[in-house]
């Protein structure tokens, strides 16, 4: 009954009664993005709190449904960015590896590889000033697609996609 913007709804593999979804919106205006609920409406629960200087984005289930993955990005302090995994039963969080500033990412059906598209800026679009937009329009940024080897915990650039939310 809350007046929230829900998104990224996903049914858990091997457990179709568990649904992962997010409270969508600018990261600094929501207090928790990651949520779980059972298909009958029970076990509605927040997976983790989200302070206003933390971005959590593009959550997805691992193919076996044992965990879900997401990007974790601090916007202040050390500005840590990494891929994290969470157990949907215990809500225990695990750091998989550091990563580039992905806007989106997903894994293959064996969870051997992931691909991510970088967004070219570590400043979220709703916080870009007019001056920053003009400056970015004339530069080649970190707009790459990356391949991640999950076992080796490494990433490499595959190609430059050159697209942007800005234009």
Language-model features: where?
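Conserved beta-propeller blade repeats
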Residues: 2-19, 51-71, 99-117, 121, ...
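A short loop-to-beta-strand structural motif that recurs across blades of beta-propeller domains
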Residues: 33-35, 82-84, 144-146
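Loop-centered beta-sheet repeat module
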Residues: 2-46
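Short strand-connecting beta-turns/loops that link adjacent beta-strands
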Residues: 14-16, 27-28, 52, 64, ...
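Extended hydrophobic-aromatic, low-complexity segments
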Residues: 82, 94-95, 105, 124-127, ...
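Multi-bladed beta-propeller domains
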Residues: 1-4, 37-55, 85-102, 149-166
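Short, conserved, GDST-rich strand-edge loop motifs in beta-rich repeat architectures
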Residues: 21-31, 73-77, 116-140
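C-terminal closing repeat unit and adjoining cap/tail of repeat-based domains
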Residues: 117-121, 131-167
């Amino acid at each position: 009954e809350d007046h929230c913007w829900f998104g990224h709804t996903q049914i858990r593999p091997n457990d179709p009664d568990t649904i992962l979804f997010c409270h969508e919106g600018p990261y600094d205006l929501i207090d928790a993005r990651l949520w779980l609920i059972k298909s009958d409406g029970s076990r509605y629960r927040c997976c983790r709190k989200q302070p206003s200087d933390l971005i959590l984005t593009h959550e997805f289930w691992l193919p076996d449904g044992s965990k879900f993955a997401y990007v974790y990005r601090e916007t202040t302090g050390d500005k840590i960015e990494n891929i994290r995994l969470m157990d949907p039963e215990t809500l225990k969080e695990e750091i998989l590896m550091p990563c580039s500033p992905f806007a989106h990412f997903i894994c293959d059906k064996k969870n051997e590889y992931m691909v991510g598209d970088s967004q070219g800026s570590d400043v979220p679009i709703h916080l870009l000033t007019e001056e920053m937009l003009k400056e970015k329009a004339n530069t080649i940024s970190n707009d790459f697609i990356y391949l991640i080897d999950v076992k080796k915990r490494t990433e490499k650039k595959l190609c430059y996609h050159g697209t942007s939310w800005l234009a």
